[in-house]
Amino acid sequence: MQTTVPSSVLDIYRMLPEGTRCEVLYNQLSMSPSPSTEHQLISFKLSGLLFVFLEKSNKGIAFAAPTDVYFEVEQSVVQPDLLVILDENKAIIQKDGIYGAPDVIFEILSANRKHDTLKKKTLYEKAGVKEYFIIDPSDNSVAMFAFNGSKQYEMIYEEKGRILSDILGCDLNF
């Protein structure tokens, strides 16, 4: 019997069983535990709000974790908590995942805060994600990062329980 030896971290990732909570960040595998109940509640509420908004506005489509997002930049595959792809960018949606930068990404902080606030923020910035929202489930605070005319993310606002998106043109309270 002939076996295939993986030649990259991405090959190893693709061999993992479906549903494995794992990402490839900067060509390194990163496992994560199941999210907290607070995390899940926020994700559920926000995904419902986004779904209703996008259905009414016909602007795009939302996906929830676990949806693989493949970035050529930094050889990374991530599973954001929520993401939105506008209609004009739907070509990046493939059967097995998203290949390229979603227009908007939402990450709900977990125990490993550095993962979302530093590593993923840097990756999303390099990949060209237009808006990045970081939600802290401990107090429902939302920090929104965008390019704002520059090549680097700037914090646009920080507020509790409110999503203001210029890209989507929405104001959602959760």
Regions from the language model: what does each represent?
Residues M1-F174:
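Gly/Pro/Ser/Thr-rich low-complexity, intrinsically disordered segments predominantly at protein N-termini
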